[in-house]
């Protein structure tokens, strides 16, 4: 994969390296995807991903969490920021020409309702892009695989549950599960691919433990890295580059979906602004 931007450097200087590493891979996928306006970002969070990924303005960023969405203002990437639940969007039917939801749906208990509502506010034929972890996420965790190899199956199961919990995952489902959800909402999958190999996942997994200094820096100084400069992260960029430049893998822990809104669905009558 080639890119005009060095997404790896851009992300890891702004985030803990394990998160920035993954986001850099995902940013590159969008370079070849069409996002006609008006664009909806479902679960925009603090806006960092969109600010680093897209050159164009995003029309609307939507997120239910008060703190992160107010942080998103600093990037001036969104024309409008809306604090609202994704299952009850305050927009008319067929308003948006495209939508994305980057590493969001796996955290939402009512993912089906969010998909249904996203379909409602999209125009027929509009693209919708999203990425989520799949069952390989828990199966490929290095510590759990070690316990499997030495016969401690109960320890492996407990670790997988623990890591999924700290990752705040509600869903790590296969493409056929998402295909059923999408069909119910009124989407058709055009294509999908797995990415993030077992070795890349191990790098992310151990980053949760080695990233404690970044968390301390964030708490004390309001930033993940005290010196976010190329000279300070060049060694880390070199270490991660082999994974970032070749992210596709049949046993990848994450899946990226390219879908199309293919039919009109009935909008829930009780939507409202959430303040």
PLM segments and residue spans:
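Conserved N-terminal segment of class I S-adenosyl-L-methionine
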Residues: 1-92, 98-100, 115, 249-257, ...
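Glycine/Thr-rich phosphate-binding loops of Rossmann-like dinucleotide-binding domains
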Residues: 49-50, 109, 138-139
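Residue-level "edge-of-site" marker
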Residues: 85, 104, 195-196
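Active-site micro-motifs of SAM-dependent methyltransferase domains
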Residues: 88, 106, 137
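A short SAM/SAH-binding and catalytic strip from SAM-dependent methyltransferases
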Residues: 98-109
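Helix-to-beta-strand junctions that scaffold the AdoMet/dcAdoMet cofactor pocket
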Residues: 108-109, 122-124
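S-adenosyl-L-methionine-dependent methyltransferase catalytic module, highlighting the catalytic core
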Residues: 112-117, 127-258, 270
